[in-house]
Design a protein with these regions (language model features):
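Binuclear metal-dependent phosphoesterase catalytic core
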Residues: 111-120, 206-220, 229-295
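Accessory, non-catalytic peripheral segments of nucleic-acid enzymes
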Residues: 37, 42, 252-390
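Divalent metal-coordination and catalytic microenvironments
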Residues: 8, 28, 48, 63, ...
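Short, surface-exposed amphipathic charged segments that create phosphate/polyanion-binding patches used
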Residues: 117-125, 244, 335-345
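General small-molecule cofactor/ligand-binding pocket signal
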Residues: 4, 103-105, 127, 228, ...
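His/Asp/Glu-rich metal-coordinating catalytic cores
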Residues: 55-56, 62, 68, 72-226
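N-terminal active-site segment of His-dependent metallophosphoesterases
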Residues: 1-66, 154, 369, 373-378, ...
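Glycine-rich phosphate-binding loop signature in dinucleotide/nucleotide-binding domains
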Residues: 35-39, 120, 146-149, 291-292
Length: 390
């Protein structure tokens, strides 16, 4: 049985104020083309359909168009909600969608949904478990009665311990949101979402785990549960853009215990690139300008001082400069933060020191200090309210 696995669409997401609707429509159409070419028996979409629990009308239209194209392929599809989604919104109309072969995980009610598909090797049980808090996810996974003599697949949206994170994932402090890969040991393949870097975590029945290189294009596992993050179809941070190939995951299930994983690379409408150099060198480099003109750009200037109106001038050369940083300011900020954190100063003192390092010979005004104090108080009040709610 051939499965196509994707996740973390984050429809409606913006980066540095840039609307990505055209990029998302483009990549979703590319995924539909791959589905038509590969003809999988099922498509697995492992959560974070939207970037917000209350998606915009335009984001909903994009997903609606994608679902229409998906239904037209005639492929059975299994979709769960992630931590960015509202379960009620994503599951709306699910009984009608079932008739078109598109199956949404309902709002979790302690009973993970299971659908049985058949091929020449027998049944494949496909379970859907939407995003849950780690303690609830572990309980839910432990309660599923799995027939281990058959092939079992689960679509899930969790953070498995030892997964490699990128900058675009939201991280919880510590390991409170982690679950062990051993929770998936009853399954042959775990189609996961939540982590944006594609990677495979192979978990043996004996509970020995390893994390593969995210760049691996083909892995095989026999007698193991293969835990796989397909990754997001688009790069949502510059740290992902230069070293990670975005892809869809193709899974081949043959006889019990035989799982083969391959990837098909995706080509985005706009690449995300980081370019670095002096202002003068960057705008005069004709080869660089030609190569990057249409891309989404992060510029790191290595000039010793600020350049007048640098952002506007760069945007006249490169169409989509998203953000601009100065290397010397980053280095100064890092040095200040490291030094001051070691002294365990109060937040206000740390901020004043940071300000003075960035503006040599100039102190914060009384108004700025008052404003800073108000912001710090609001942060602490919000934290205390969260602690009381917990």
């Amino acid at each position: 049985m051939k499965l196509l696995h994707i996740s973390d669409l984050h429809i409606g997401k913006r980066i540095y104020g840039y609307d990505l609707e055209d990029d998302q429509r483009f990549i979703l159409k590319e995924i539909i083309d791959i589905i038509n070419d590969e003809k999988p028996d099922a498509v697995l979409i492992a959560g974070d359909i939207y970037d917000r629990a209350d998606p915009s009308a335009s984001a909903v239209r994009i997903f609606d168009d994608f679902l229409s194209m998906l239904a037209s392929t005639g492929t059975e599809s299994f979709i769960i909600y992630g931590n960015h989604d509202s379960g009620h919104r994503v599951a709306y109309g699910s009984r009608l969608f079932d008739r078109a072969g598109i199956h949404f995980s309902p709002v979790y009610d302690r009973e993970p949904q299971c659908t049985v598909l058949e091929d020449e090797y027998g049944p494949v049980n496909i379970y859907m478990l939407p995003y849950l808090r780690s303690v609830d996810a572990e309980e839910a996974l432990g309660s599923i009665e799995v027939d281990k003599s058959q092939r079992n697949v689960i679509v899930s949206h969790q953070f498995v311990t030892s997964a490699v994170l990128g900058d675009s994932e939201e991280m919880n402090v510590g390991t409170l949101d982690n679950i062990s890969g051993s929770c998936y040991s009853a399954f042959d393949y775990a189609a996961l979402g939540h982590i944006h870097m594609p990677q495979t975590i192979a978990r043996s029945r004996a509970d020995a785990d390893s994390t593969s290189d995210p760049e691996d294009s083909k892995e095989e596992a026999a007698g193991q549960c293969v835990i796989r993050y397909s990754g997001s179809p688009l790069a949502y941070s510059f740290s992902e853009s230069d070293r990670i190939h975005k892809s869809v995951t193709i899974v081949q299930l043959k006889e019990k215990g035989s799982v083969e994983v391959q990837t098909i690379d995706l080509s985005p409408l706009h690449k995300m690139r980081t370019i670095k150099g002096t202002f003068s060198d960057l705008i005069k480099d004709e080869g660089l300008v030609e190569k990057c003109r249409k891309d989404y750009i992060k510029v790191i200037l290595t000039d010793d001082a600020g350049v007048m109106d640098a952002m506007n001038r760069l945007q006249k050369v490169f169409d989509n400069v998203m953000t601009l940083e100065y290397e010397y300011m980053r280095q100064q900020a890092e040095e200040v933060l490291i030094e001051e954190i070691h002294t365990e100063g109060a937040p206000g003192d740390l901020f004043e020191s940071f300000y003075e390092e960035q503006h040599p010979g100039k102190e914060m005004s009384g108004y700025q200090k008052d404003l800073m104090d108000k912001v710090i108080r609001k942060i602490w009040e919000g934290q205390e309210a969260c602690d009381e709610a917990d």
